[in-house]
Amino acid sequence: MAELLAIKWDDNRDKLILLDQTILPNKIEYIEYDTAEGVYDSIKDMIVRGAPAIGVTAAYGLYFAAKVAPEDNFENFFKYLKEKSSYLDSSRPTAVNLSWALKVMESKALENKDKDVKEIKSILREEAKRIHEEDIEICKTIGENLITLLKDGMGILTHCNAGQLATSKYGTATSPMYLAKEKGWNFKVYSDETRPRLQGSTLTALELYEAGIDVTTITDNMAAMVMSQGKIDAVIVGCDRVAANGDTANKIGTMGVSILAKYFGIPMYIAAPTPSIDINTKTGEDIPIEERNPEEVTSRFGAWTAPKGVKVYNPGFDVTPHENITAIVTEKGIVYPPFKENLKKLFEK
């Protein structure tokens, strides 16, 4: 699946290369970026999507800003960097990895403020690359932790895309699926279509199918029936932000899946890199929810699917209550309820 990596870095040409996910599965095209403005647009327009991938992309975007920042003194350089960081951070408000990656880059600049500005620019380049490489390792470790909760022969439901296309590699929710495939396990994955942008059918189903994993696409409103038929043994989803109490923001529709899973007694697992866990956000009520273009709901494939001018409510995310979550699986280990206490302990390790 190397050809379907969401993010590539060209070290020789100093360019970020992103897979255009808005045209999948019909076309596979990559777009090159070397400016903060281009990176902003790639995040806003969902050329790149998925919290981990957004964070990595933003880190490179801030490096591109640093490249053209003033070099006369650190104060002017950092002022410019902060302005561009705020600009990039405004591209999508819900995914905490975005602000996390930008803060890491800012901190790296501050740590080296006594050095020549040109040297700081090189340091930020290496820091963006480190964030990229770290994401790959985090995803693999999450998969290794998640697979301990699964068994050969299981049926797994996932929602949206927390796969390789949402991260630097492996994915979070899909990482154990790739590892199980390597082990020779026989298992089935059911991929919710995920209205309105269809990330489950256009992205998750695509990458799993290409990897030779047994995947079946279902519409979102089929999940209850599939669960009632005993076809689902576990639900695994990713996340865009986890609050301190375990409430989890993920793609719209995830909350409904969690309610169904709880009703049918099916474990609900959140695959969460620690950068997606926001201890400073107390509960899900404090998570900002992005509202997206109404036309994502009212038109598709060049045709209107609702009356022109009809009112539309199109939040990009919902919040799954912590009561509906069986475990939050991170690269540092598996966290069980009570989440408020145990997530805090996770960061004290």
Curated annotation (Swiss-Prot):
Keyword Acyltransferase: no
Transmembrane segments: none
GO molecular function: S-methyl-5-thioribose-1-phosphate isomerase activity
Record EC number: 5.3.1.-
Pathway assignment: Carbohydrate degradation
Protein residues bound to substrate: 49-51, 92, 199, 250-251
Residues of the site described as Transition state stabilizer: 160
Active site (catalytic residues): 240
Gene3D superfamilies the UniProt entry points to: translation initiation factor eif-2b, domain 1, Translation initiation factor eif-2b, domain 2
Gene Ontology terms describing biological process: L-methionine salvage from methylthioadenosine; pentose catabolic process
Catalytic activity as recorded in UniProt: 5-deoxy-alpha-D-ribose 1-phosphate = 5-deoxy-D-ribulose 1-phosphate
Enzyme class: isomerase
UniProtKB keywords: Carbohydrate metabolism, Isomerase
Function: Catalyzes the isomerization of 5-deoxy-alpha-D-ribose 1-phosphate to 5-deoxy-D-ribulose 1-phosphate, as part of a 5-deoxyribose salvage pathway that recycles this toxic radical SAM enzyme by-product to mainstream metabolites.
Similarity annotation: Belongs to the EIF-2B alpha/beta/delta subunits family. DrdI subfamily.
PANTHER family: METHYLTHIORIBOSE-1-PHOSPHATE ISOMERASE
Name this protein carries in UniProt: 5-deoxyribose 1-phosphate isomerase
Native species: Clostridium botulinum (strain Okra / Type B1)
